Amino acid sequence: MLLLPSCFAQGPKLTVSEPQKVTLKRGSSATVKITAALNEGFHANSHTPSDENLIPLTLNWTPGVAVAKDVVYPKPKMEKYSFSDKPLSVVTGSFDLTTTFAVPASAPAGDGFLTGKLRYQACNDKACFPPKNVEVKVPVTVQ
């Protein structure tokens, strides 16, 4: 039987807090905030990684009752790790991503969801892990 050190027992995990229901008004714009968190001991590359071989943090929304116009990512930190010669642009702990949506005047009234995928590459202080996607689902009411 092979026993791995505890640092490998639990890999990175990014969780997204359940978003509050958002009211969208037809013909206007709305802002939606998503809060995500990485487990302790891990970081994710920022949306602007400092090395071209690293995979950026991205939030992509599926077109639906509203269209994503702008995503504001968390302000990254520059941190040095043993596996890199230079500091890396990363996010750690809990962080927010804010998206501005345009709601068409023709959007159907009623309840629904805005759906998207948050893609990230997590690392610890020794190595980076394969990228993962987390589904994001925001309940909305269109008026």
Where are the regions that the model predicts?
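Bacterial N-terminal signal peptides
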Residues: 1-6
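Extracellular/lumen-exposed scaffold segments
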Residues: 7-143
